[in-house]
């Protein structure tokens, strides 16, 4: 996992379910964000929930596997701080 993915996982660990727009604030490039979200979803670390409203909203949250990994990363981050 690269730093952008780690940043996403730690953000979700802290905030819970988040909207795409919440995550977009973490990145200068939405392309980078979209690629990382797709990779994390394929690895089954996050799940996406789409609400068919106007405008359509996408929500992301950690899977159990994602929570486990994010918790470990958070411990490492605390150790290094």
Show the residue positions of the predicted features.
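N-terminal helix-turn-helix DNA-binding core of bacterial DNA-binding proteins
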Residues: 1-31
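N-terminal leader segment of winged-helix/HTH proteins
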Residues: 3, 42-45, 62
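Canonical helix-turn-helix DNA-binding module
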Residues: 24-56
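Basic, amphipathic "hinge/linker" alpha-helix immediately C-terminal to the N-terminal HTH DNA-binding motif
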Residues: 54-73
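Alpha-helical linker/hinge and terminal dimerization helices associated
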Residues: 72-81
